[in-house]
């Protein structure tokens, strides 16, 4: 098969161009994934795994004002390198990340080149230039051709606020369509997943996106392939409600430095769906951290959030709303339950001017911050991107001095070069003031959270807020995003609904919203949906009535030392286990079809463990809040039989028993024995 694939690539290239191309073949460390590059009058790349084509020959190039990088190329040098390294991850799903691949660097006349990498589970390439003067990037060509008309999970957007479909909140259900059925008038944002047949999947995304527009995809001329599309550079913009929307764009996509690297174009190739739940490729390809040696002030954790529950607390002697007493109530709730943060969402200030706060007689922000400090609770403030991008030099020092710990910055709603560059500038300025940031209304993560670890989360997901106004198949979506969107990085889905309804009973309600699905599905989201900054979205009054669920939620960490994917299927159910210290957390959630799954505890080291498990109740198909809590003793290798109700879930905590912990200590104990006159160290 491989021989035929190489021949096909050569035939396509030679038939199209008179110049005989140079063919390069680069293999993964395990020799099972191959990247094939053809460089001549055009540059094409293709990929295969286990001898099966996964990406057919696909052309790539960058068009400048007077030349095309990728046409009629002349190679000046080529070199291969084996990369085998690891790094300590900051606030991630595991403690250490491995970067193991083979790399090919090609340099061409004209002071530019390409870097290709092959991992066991991914292929990637990026352009680079070494020129003195700045460059105008008129367009880029990036194709992903498939060997067949494959089924896609495509997050397609239709948003014409700017007249050109380049404004987006980056929230969309997945259109499960064949590639040839891709709507011609639309774009898909990343990540996008293709089913390559059997159990194999191909996920397309990008990494290390800096000072350059983000990539969208649409159908290319082959009819069974996708091509990159980029937002043109914005020249003029205007306020549209609280967005800043371009109304005039240039005929180019970016103006960049002449010496730079461009974003990685990435295709993740998995042999099973569960592999997608534990893929580090975006983290690996991102630029290393720039925050400095001391980032101890970047402290992940959970937050009590106001906006989703509409400030609807009850049983108090004051009027609930955006006022001092309400936020002191949220702070009390957070302190009682060891929740480290609260988020003060929209309403504390003018949306477009963060120096204009509502009167102290209504909301005394300094009093709230002082009260929070006394209770050892941090405060995040909501703000629009428009306001922050214009006022950060003034307001970041101001609010940091008052005691604010971070900002939730919303309504970017674009990923053109201007906005992408601003995400780095905001993160840097925030770090200078020891502020964390949570980006909302924004494109997918591409590694900025590694470069600037004070970026503690991203939205870029159709989260729980949609239950306030939409009746959609959210459970199938939540059973899909762990494999697709979450592969890109942290995901601020904002779980935690305590009003849980079946599909038959569900209805959108703004003031007292509910989730479609079961209580256990909400609990499972805290284990499965990774974000260092995790919301508790329902209101404190409701949580206090649901103390058993609350106590479980607030014990779940937001960063982990190890992640183990369990048997899963995209769009049907997702299951995984995560370890923090000596304790394991396990979760599973499903679509609207009831199903029986098995949770294999073979990931546990040998020993005896205490298990606390939450199962869908026997009547969860009739009443979404029905659940069963069970405490049992389990051992490694046991298999838990789990029934998922429609929109159901399962969640649990597994920790070593006292006897097991004692045995581990004995096993690790070092005995000093004496033999004649020489000490002997015996490890047991």
Tell where the protein language model's regions lie, with residue ranges:
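Bacterial Sec-dependent N-terminal signal peptides
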Residues: 1-22
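N-terminal accessory beta-strand-rich subdomains and adjacent acidic, glycine-rich linkers
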Residues: 21-284, 290
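An acidic-aromatic substrate-binding cleft motif
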Residues: 253, 257-333, 337
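Conserved, mostly hydrophobic/aromatic
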Residues: 334, 410, 437, 528, ...
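Aromatic- and carboxylate-enriched substrate-binding clefts and catalytic-loop regions
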Residues: 345-518
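Glycan-recognition and catalytic regions of carbohydrate-active enzymes
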Residues: 538-585, 621-625, 667-669, 673-677
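Carbohydrate-binding surface patches
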Residues: 570-606, 610, 650-651
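C-terminal beta-strand-rich structural cap/linker in extracellular carbohydrate-active enzymes
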Residues: 633-680
